[in-house]
UniProtKB/Swiss-Prot annotation:
This is Putative beta-hexosaminidase. GO terms for cellular component: extracellular region; membrane. It comes from Pinctada maxima (Silver-lipped pearl oyster). Its main location: secreted. Its EC number is 3.2.1.52.
């Protein structure tokens, strides 16, 4: 009998195993054989939406059934916004289609959470037969001009007998499934967007590039010292490191710094008394005496001298000594020998920081160690780490086995396919379907803090106590303790780009402050374990006030509907008082935990729009005007990062208002966002928005930290605003530094991180440490009136371009020649390398000339797939040849650029053709052909032409204004759905005028017809079909309420500002385009042109006429006015 029972048991086990194998084989039959293709067709779809096409092909030998499976993918934008019910956070057409959009070819689309969507085949439709293709079209809320807007690792699941199997779709493991961007329809974000056109080799060619020499770069230190004098005579490091100090409190730390230096160069180590004569080595002395007193950071100053007898580094404090050691390493990097001479140096700012987003995508402990080393090399001294955001929680707060909140890192630090999110956060941002991602252990963080302390780097933790906090909220709600930090009865709408109510902490729940206090205590314990004091904390996001107004926790209990309405009205009137009290409580809690410095994004310390006339430009005073007492019992620092315009409020003015009202100010304008692309290349990593397409090396080099009227994106010239749009500068010592930022939501690999960070991090370090003489030539533009003609004239200031270009050429040249090799050799980090340029030479034979802006690099060429030819200057080719080029370092073959293909025709490149359009436009014909065909002449001035300040324009020249800004600021917006350069009554063309055909005419014609159907089909509500056998609508859409909106929505919801990000700094949204209007472009005086050419002015006049804009502005209690007499802060 026993053997019978045993046999039954074995049979059961075998059946289970067979079922598991069968299920796994079934899912692999689907995921291995589904070929996904994704294509952005046009960014000029209905209501300025992006039209995107998805093709699903069965490349296997078996049919794929139409039931039993469904697939998931991440999309960074809201899809089909016209049919999305924000209040319910789901699609809604009618009850039978609740939460679905019916796509063509038999699929349903469903929003899940975060960026995740699910497509499900409609049962009884038809299986996908071998070599069969299914297509459907997506409408995305914003434009898309990069492959990196898409995410890899689509995956599918099968459900059989209650068991779920998941597997990644093999064809989407990288971004090769995204088709090329190949015309102005998917290059352009808005009409006239010439700077978004990708560069061709002909556009890069520079026949007169002045390369830096070895002698110029051999002893070039980046960042540039204040004073340096070196000679060609050299010496080695000697035999011993001597160290000494009169300050016994730092003796142990000085020993560790000296020991690290001795081990690196294999030298002896001897402690000495300051003043003791030594020779044949390196002398490290902390004197305690200031080298310079009237400088922002005297402790970081140092003096380095090199003679035949000794290498001497002296500093008043340990930070300066560490800076001196890094300068010594830079001087000796070329051949491990030091030149005779001396350096005297100190920084322009005490705060030179990087905000590194480790929460969205986790880089790992080893990478962070390398990053600290690079920061020290280039004298950056603050590292801000967001511990969590919507995408993850990245720190083990406590390693005790019984720690009650282990779910924070165990759930928040991992992603997998778990819809209930009990074991991990739901898969997102292209993560694998299986468990992926990671977090720092407590021991890892202790090591990082210790290492940073010896490198003169302070690690500052950023906490999101407000929006963008889902990585902390979800683990706590799913843990056994069930700590809710939000209101589960609230509506789902919290953030348009993250439509889930559990992504924002509720300030009215006491659990939120308990969590915040717990985080501070745990962090303090971690710093204590590293023997480093926790001095500073950062608040990385503001409160979501939609949540405050809707949550029951923000009102007294047991209110009837009338009382609740009255309380809501009172709260809405006093919302800025509520915000101030919550901010004060955050600062007080930090101070109570022994933290005396609190940083926060600028929105935390400013008001919201209210009936009293307060705006985001109204800054809370640090002193209470009624009691004359300090509001905050800790030092408060505002990270000034918003330089956009909201309802005609110029937010770049806030920096001076912070300084005037007692805050320390760190400037962090958009030009310091390293997540922006290096160049407008759809194939390379990097983000963008409607204002900034890319930030080049030259653009970043011209960053002027001391100018409070410049560094403003898309100001009409040189990123400087009008003098009237600038405020009186606050106390100079209130501006304490700069903060660069890297948002990693779209960066799936460390290769992408490195490409965006390096070498731009070095340029940022140069501007943050060293002030160049030409910086003062960046000034605001001045407006005056001609007393005779009464005409308003703008005098545009011109920077000192000769000095700028000369210094830029030397610094960027030495970065290529020396620093990129240092990054590869010493740190193992591969920086971005610019591709080469080339052009066709005239003559009887076809020849090409090649060049590169990367000093000491070669151009390599491959013809028809043959091996690469080194150091190409001139190359003979045939017209039918396929020529590929790349830039490569002769000593480091892995240090190379992407490959580019050279078009062997004499036709101008798209950029060259657009340059001609731009030159015509700048001849005071901006939009003339389009405008005259579209609208009658103006009755007041039929010959009017919008003003243009510069006589010439080159789309690749950062010094010139952006024509997209000019064209968008002046003409009325184009009708929705109108592609660039369209005339009325024209059919949708196979390509825009002036753009060479980049596809065969047949394909382009089909593309045009397909998009034309979409445009003509708008306004038809097609959601009246039944589920089985869905007929195909325009552009392959069914179930899309395109024109009128649904479920109580009046039309399509207006687009929120920017493509969504919860991490810019966290909680900050990038500037975007609202359908039907253009962003404000500073520096364009409104009085120079009629209102109809300026949508902002027209809208403002209409609002004032309707009484929506008050003539006088009041101030909320607690919203401070400037204490500078001639300047108001309201």
């Amino acid at each position: 009998m026993k053997w019978v029972k045993s046999g039954v048991g074995i049979l059961g086990i075998l059946l289970i195993i067979c079922h598991a194998v069968t299920s796994q084989r079934r899912i692999l039959d689907i995921t291995d054989n589904l070929k996904i293709t994704f294509k952005t067709i046009s960014n000029f779809g209905p209501r300025a939406q992006s039209i995107q096409n998805v093709t699903i092909e069965n490349v296997g030998i078996k049919d794929i059934p139409d039931f039993g499976w469904r697939c998931y993918f991440c999309h960074d934008q809201l899809l089909f916004p016209g049919t999305f019910n924000l209040a319910r956070s789901q699609y809604f057409l009618r009850p039978i289609l609740d939460n679905y959009v019916v796509l063509s070819d038999g699929f349903l689309l469903e929003f899940i959470k975060g960026c995740m969507y699910r497509i499900t085949p409609i049962p009884r439709n038809a299986p996908i037969k071998t070599r069969d293709k299914r297509e459907f079209t997506l409408l995305a809320e914003q434009f898309s001009v990069s492959k990196y807007d898409s995410f890899p690792n689509w995956y599918c699941e099968t459900i059989s007998g209650g068991n779920t199997e998941v597997a990644n779709i093999r064809s989407t493991e990288n971004l090769k499934y995204v088709e090329d961007f190949d015309s102005s329809y998917n290059w352009f974000r808005i009409p006239h967007d010439f700077r978004s056109v990708p560069l061709q080799p002909q556009d890069r060619y520079s026949a007169n590039h002045k390369a830096s020499s070895v002698e110029e770069c051999k002893y070039k230190v980046i960042p540039t010292p204040v004073k340096a004098s070196v000679r060609k005579v050299q010496r080695n490091f000697g035999t011993t490191v001597y160290y000494g100090t009169t300050d016994t409190s730092i003796r142990g730390k000085l020993f560790k710094v000296a020991e690290k230096l001795a081990l690196k160069h294999k030298l002896g180590l001897v402690e000495m008394t300051p003043g003791q004569p030594v020779n044949n080595g390196i002398s490290l002395v902390v004197t305690g005496n200031y080298i310079e007193r009237n400088i922002p950071s005297p402790d970081e100053a140092y003096r380095l001298s090199v003679s035949a007898d000794l290498i001497s580094i002296e500093a008043p404090a340990l930070p300066g000594l560490i800076n001196g050691i890094e300068t010594m390493h830079s001087l000796s990097a070329w051949d491990m020998a030091l030149p005779y001479g001396g350096v005297k140096d100190f920084p322009r700012f005490p705060f030179r920081g990087i905000f590194l987003d480790i929460a969205s995508n986790f880089p790992g402990y080893n990478y962070m160690m390398k990053f600290l080393t690079v920061m020290a090399q280039y004298k950056l001294n603050k590292l801000v780490l967001p511990l969590y955001n919507n995408e993850g929680f990245r720190l083990e707060l406590n390693d005790s086995p019984g720690y009650e909140f282990q779910a924070l890192h165990l759930v928040g630090g991992n992603r997998c396919h778990d819809l209930k999110e009990e074991n991990c956060l739901f898969s997102q941002l292209g993560s694998f379907a299986g468990n992926s991602d990671g977090y720092l252990t407590k021991g890892d963080m202790v090591d990082l803090i210790k290492t940073a302390d010896l490198l003169n780097i302070e690690i500052i933790m950023s906490l999101n106590i407000g929006e963008s906090a889902r990585g902390a909220i979800v683990p706590l709600k799913t843990s056994k303790h069930n700590r809710l930090l939000y209101d589960p009865e609230d509506t789902d709408f919290v953030d348009r780009f993250y439509p889930q109510k559990d992504s924002s902490m509720n300030p009215c729940r006491e659990e939120t402050m308990i969590f915040y206090d717990h985080m501070l205590k745990q962090l303090k314990a971690i710093y204590k374990a590293a023997s480093v004091p926790l001095k500073t904390i950062m608040i990385g996001s503001k409160v979501n006030f939609d949540q405050v107004l809707n949550s029951k926790y923000c009102y007294p209990k047991n209110l009837n509907s009338t009382q609740r309405l009255m309380e809501r009205e009172n709260l809405e009137r006093n919302i800025n008082g509520f915000k101030l009290n919550f901010t004060k409580r955050l600062v007080k809690t930090a101070h109570d935990n022994g933290i005396n410095e609190v940083m926060a994004i600028d929105d935390v310390f400013t008001t919201e729009f209210d009936a009293a006339g307060n705006t985001p430009n109204t800054v809370y005073d640090t002193v209470d005007s009624e009691t004359n007492k300090t509001r905050f019992n800790a030092t408060v620092t505002a990270v000034h990062s918003r330089y956009d315009t909201v309802r005609d409020e110029r937010l770049w003015k806030r920096g001076d208002r912070f300084a005037e009202l007692g805050y320390k100010v760190i400037i962090s304008p958009p030009i310091l966002d390293f997540n922006y692309a290096v160049e407008p290349d759809p194939d390379r990593p990097g983000d963008y928005d409607s204002v900034i397409r890319n930030i080049s090396f030259s653009k970043l080099f011209r960053f002027v930290p001391d100018s409070h009227c410049c560094n403003i994106p898309n100001a009409i010239q040189h990123d400087c605003a009008l003098e009237s749009d600038c405020t009186t500068a606050g106390p100079p010592d209130s501006y304490i530094g700069t903060l660069g930022k890297l948002d990693t939501r779209k960066l799936r690999s460390l290769k992408d991180w490195n490409e965006l960070l390096f070498p731009r991090l070095l340029i940022f370090a140069e501007r943050s440490w060293h002030k160049s003489s030409w910086e003062d030539s960046f000034e605001p533009h001045r407006v005056r009136m001609n007393n005779i003609t009464r005409q308003i004239i703008t005098n545009y200031t011109v920077p000192n371009w000769n000095d700028i270009i000369q210094e830029e050429s030397k610094v960027l040249g030495c970065i290529s020649r020396k620093e990129k090799l240092r990054l590869m050799h010493e740190d193992g980090l591969k920086p971005y390398v610019e591709p080469p340029g080339a052009r066709l030479l005239g003559g009887n034979t076809m020849r090409i000339a090649a060049s590169t802006t990367e000093d000491s690099f070669w151009v390599q060429a491959s013809v028809n797939g043959n091996p690469w030819t080194d150091n190409v200057k001139v190359l003979d080719v045939n017209p039918t040849d396929s020529v590929r080029l790349r830039t490569v370092h002769p000593a480091k073959a892995e240090l190379r650029s992407k490959e580019v293909k050279l078009n062997l025709t004499s036709l101008p490149t798209p950029r060259e053709q657009f340059r001609k359009i731009a030159q015509d436009a700048l001849s005071r014909r901006i939009g003339i052909d389009i405008q005259r065909a579209r609208m009658p002449p103006m009755p007041v001035n039929p010959t009017y032409r919008p003003p243009v300040p510069l006589p010439s324009f080159d789309p690749a020249d950062d010094r010139a204004p952006d024509l997209a800004a000019i064209a968008a600021a002046h003409p009325p917006p184009l009708p929705p759905g109108m592609p660039p350069h369209m005339m009325p009554n024209m059919p949708f063309p196979p390509r825009p005028p002036f753009v060479p055909p980049l596809l065969p005419p047949g394909q382009m014609r089909a593309l045009g017809q397909q998009a034309g159907q979409a445009l003509r089909g708008q306004g038809q509500q097609t959601g009246q079909q039944t589920l089985p056998a869905q007929p195909r609508g325009p552009m392959g859409l069914t179930g899309q309420a395109a024109g009128t909106g649904v479920a109580g929505q009046s039309g399509q919801q207006p687009s929120a500002a920017g493509q969504g990000t919860q991490q810019g700094l966290p909680g900050q949204q990038r500037t975007g385009v609202v359908p039907g209007q253009w962003p404000f472009f500073p520096g364009m005086p409104a009085a120079q042109f009629p209102p109809m050419f300026n949508p902002q002015m027209q809208r403002a006049l209409q609002m004032r006429g309707q009484g929506q804009i008050p003539q006088t502005q009041g101030a909320v209690a607690g919203a401070g006015q400037s204490r500078v007499p001639q300047q108001q802060a309201g």
